């Protein structure tokens, strides 16, 4: 689990997820049903769609879970 900060952080987490899965980017693309160039276009977009994040996670054998928690309040 990680706390979302921004899209750059999310992209780094996705790259780590792919590495941890033991799959190559080409294999992830194949499991997603897209060409490797399309996969690169997806992960290099400025704003990732939740749908794309979910598809990448699933291709790597993971499930995307989203949880909302109360923000910490500064006193």
Spans of features found by a protein language model:
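Key DNA-contacting residues within the recognition helix of helix-turn-helix
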Residues: 15, 40-41, 54
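The alpha-helix within a helix-turn-helix
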Residues: 18, 29, 57
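Short, basic-rich loop-to-helix N-cap that marks the start of a DNA-contacting helix
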Residues: 45-58
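C-terminal edge-of-domain segments
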Residues: 57-70
């Amino acid at each position: 689990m990680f706390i979302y900060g921004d899209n750059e952080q999310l992209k780094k987490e996705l790259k780590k997820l792919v590495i941890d899965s033991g799959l190559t980017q080409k294999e992830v693309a194949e499991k997603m049903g897209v060409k490797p160039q399309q996969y690169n276009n997806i992960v290099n977009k400025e704003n990732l769609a939740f749908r794309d994040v979910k598809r990448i996670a699933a291709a790597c054998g993971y499930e995307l879970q989203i949880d909302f928690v109360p923000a910490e309040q500064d006193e």
